[in-house]
């Protein structure tokens, strides 16, 4: 029996990363972006392009537009806070579906860095006070970019 394991690593050298970030809830999304940029810097990523969009709903179409521009991976960042209407559920559902669809159709890792929160306190704690999910999402972005590079180099069955 021949067993081979493929996994990405956290070396950012030579990676070209795109980040699509929502301006809605910008106090929080900016913290996510700071965390992501900190991670990219610490891991040696030299090229990061940031695309700002009005809200999370605009993220999937922007990701689709830039997916063919030679990026190794794309990180989508946003914060959705549940309100008293169904808007939260509708947006969260469509954004997650859209991001997954683009990733599958284009064959590029698109990392879902959208923080869903029940309230503002939870959103704040996930966006930089207790922990910064932006850093974690960026680490996943690096790992997946490297895994896809390895898969592209290996044509074995």
Swiss-Prot record:
(2S)-2-hydroxy-3-oxobutyl phosphate binds at residues 84-85, 126. Its EC number is 2.5.1.78. Keywords: Riboflavin biosynthesis, Transferase. Disulfide bonds: none annotated. It catalyses: (2S)-2-hydroxy-3-oxobutyl phosphate + 5-amino-6-(D-ribitylamino)uracil = 6,7-dimethyl-8-(1-D-ribityl)lumazine + phosphate + 2 H2O + H(+). GO terms for molecular function: 6,7-dimethyl-8-ribityllumazine synthase activity. 5-amino-6-(D-ribitylamino)uracil binds at residues 24, 56-58, 79-81, 112. Coiled coil: none annotated. GO terms for cellular component: riboflavin synthase complex. The active site is at residue 87. SUPFAM superfamilies: Lumazine synthase (SSF52121). The keyword Transferase applies. Pathway: Cofactor biosynthesis; riboflavin biosynthesis; riboflavin from 2-hydroxy-3-oxobutyl phosphate and 5-amino-6-(D-ribitylamino)uracil: step 1/2. GO terms for biological process: riboflavin biosynthetic process. Belongs to the DMRL synthase family. Catalyzes the formation of 6,7-dimethyl-8-ribityllumazine by condensation of 5-amino-6-(D-ribitylamino)uracil with 3,4-dihydroxy-2-butanone 4-phosphate. This is the penultimate step in the biosynthesis of riboflavin. PANTHER family: 6,7-DIMETHYL-8-RIBITYLLUMAZINE SYNTHASE, 6,7-DIMETHYL-8-RIBITYLLUMAZINE SYNTHASE DMRL SYNTHASE LUMAZINE SYNTHASE. NCBIfam families: lumazine-synth. This is 6,7-dimethyl-8-ribityllumazine synthase. The lineage of its organism: Archaea, Methanobacteriati, Methanobacteriota, Thermococci, Thermococcales.
């Amino acid at each position: 029996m021949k067993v081979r394991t493929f996994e990405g690593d956290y070396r950012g050298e030579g990676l070209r990363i795109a980040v699509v970030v929502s301006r809605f809830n910008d106090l929080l999304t900016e913290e996510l972006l700071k965390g992501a940029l900190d991670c990219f810097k610490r891991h040696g990523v030299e090229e990061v392009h940031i695309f700002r969009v009005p809200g999370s709903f605009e993220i999937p179409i922007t990701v689709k537009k830039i997916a063919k521009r030679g990026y190794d991976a794309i990180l989508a960042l946003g914060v959705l806070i549940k309100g008293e209407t169904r808007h939260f559920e509708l947006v969260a559902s469509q954004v997650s579906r859209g991001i997954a669809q683009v990733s599958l159709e284009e064959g590029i890792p698109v990392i879902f860095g959208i923080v869903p929160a029940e309230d503002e306190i939870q959103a704040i704690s996930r966006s930089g006070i207790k922990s910064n999910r932006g850093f974690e999402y960026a680490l996943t972005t690096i790992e997946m970019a490297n895994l896809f590079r390895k898969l592209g180099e290996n044509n074995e069955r």
